[in-house]
């Protein structure tokens, strides 16, 4: 029983650590410059940085369709 508890604690720690790395990789500080881009999800983003940040944090493949509003 102790072995299972230790294994569970280890696995929870491992998953938490992996989740923390994902969040850090996605943290992006974007400027407030307004150079709108249209994303492949049909949304207009203030600039490419905001689109990239959203794609990373949502874990979706969002690309720039064109420069300007959708």
From Swiss-Prot:
Output one GO BP term. cell differentiation
Signal peptide positions (record):
1-20
Cross-referenced Pfam families, in alphabetical order? Kazal_1
Which of UniProt's keywords are assigned here?
Answer: Disulfide bond, Ion channel impairing toxin, Neurotoxin, Protease inhibitor, Secreted, Serine protease inhibitor, Signal, Toxin
Look up keyword Zinc-finger and say if it applies.
no
Main subcellular localisation? secreted
Fetch the InterPro entries from UniProt. Kazal_dom, Kazal_dom_sf, Prot_Inhib_GrowthFact_Antg
Q: In which tissues is it expressed?
A: Expressed by the venom duct.
| Localization of this protein | Secreted
Cellular-component GO terms for this entry? extracellular region
**Alphabetical list of SUPFAM superfamilies matching this protein:** Kazal-type serine protease inhibitors (SSF100895)
Q: Where is the Kazal-like domain?
A: 21-70
Which residues form each disulfide bond in the chain?
26-56, 30-49, 38-70
**Site feature Reactive bond: at which residues?**
32-33
Determine the domain of life of the protein's source: Eukaryota
The molecular function terms of the Gene Ontology recorded here are: ion channel regulator activity; serine-type endopeptidase inhibitor activity; toxin activity
Domain observations = The cysteine framework is IX (C-C-C-C-C-C).
The record's family statement is: Belongs to the conopeptide P-like superfamily.
Function noted in UniProt: Acts as a neurotoxin by inhibiting an ion channel. May also act as a serine protease inhibitor, since it possess the kazal serine protease inhibitor signature.
Protein name per Swiss-Prot or TrEMBL: Turripeptide Gli9.1
